From Swiss-Prot:
It catalyses: carbamoyl phosphate + L-ornithine = L-citrulline + phosphate + H(+). L-ornithine binds at N169, D229, S233, M234. Carbamoyl phosphate binds at S60, T61, R62, T63, Q87, R111, H138, P139, C140, Q141, C268, L269, R296. It is found in: Cytoplasm. This is Ornithine carbamoyltransferase. It comes from Rhodopseudomonas palustris (strain BisA53). PANTHER family: ORNITHINE CARBAMOYLTRANSFERASE, MITOCHONDRIAL (PTHR45753), ORNITHINE TRANSCARBAMYLASE, MITOCHONDRIAL (PTHR45753:SF3). Belongs to the aspartate/ornithine carbamoyltransferase superfamily. OTCase family. It is an enzyme of class 2 (transferase). One of its GO terms (cellular component) is cytoplasm. Pathway: Amino-acid biosynthesis; L-arginine biosynthesis; L-arginine from L-ornithine and carbamoyl phosphate: step 1/3.
Amino acid sequence: MSNAPRHFLDLDEMPTKELRAVLDAGVALKAKLKSQKARNTLREKPLEGKTLAMIFERPSTRTRVSFDVGMRQLGGESIMLTGAEMQLGRGETIADTARVLSRYVDAIMIRILNHDALLELAEFATVPVINGLTRRSHPCQVMADLMTFEEHRGPIEGRTIAWTGDDNNVLASWAHAAERFNFTLRIATPPELAPGKPMRDWIKSSGASIVLGTDPEEAVRGADCVLTDTWVSMGDKDGEHRHNLLKPYQVNTQLMSLAKPDALFMHCLPAHRGEEVTDEVIDGPQSVVFDEAENRLHAQKGILAWCFGAVG
């Protein structure tokens, strides 16, 4: 039996069965927290005595708080290290950082733009490494999104999900999820901000039901869920140009009316109200954005439990 650590790096690298185990664990842990009567298959404090190192290249609120609280609720603890403290790849090598931290802590969560740095950290770490976010992907967010959809609408298999906006890390993880969980993902982006060749090649080779286009109305029509994200991601410098390209992709009541009557609206937050989404939509009855935010905590507890071998 392999002693290799269980890394959580990207959804397309994990079997659907294990991803489902992670989701089920998150649901069970949330139910347990909400009601002591809920059935629970995990030990009371499965991560008692465990320590998670959280590395942040840039400041973060949601990721930091949700992982810290999640570790506490599971009986463990966490410590935070900032990019300024770590000097990843600029002082000590990433490989050496991985080796040293593996001697101190039981798992590492890292939020860093450079995806290759994440992969190098995982290569040399002897403890689980969790992708808290990179420029390439954001699997923790999408696990929370999947959990939220299924809470409200049941199994996502066979459903239609629409994305309107630009190509980014959240969309990449949604594409991976579409292949793993067998649902249709319709993507509408400006031609200038469409998924690049690596993602287009992956979509073609994966056989996933993913439709690329430029018309937001066509993408949203008849969808079970409508997704968007901020138009200017971290590190982007051409904000005004991007805003002009993306104005036709705003999620408003007119666009939402084309989706199914019971369609959900999702946004990973923080939202720029009046830009990618209107107040009427994000505060409306179809919006589940704050359930998504809450479920970051519970989905990530499922991820932590899986990484430590408490589930799956």
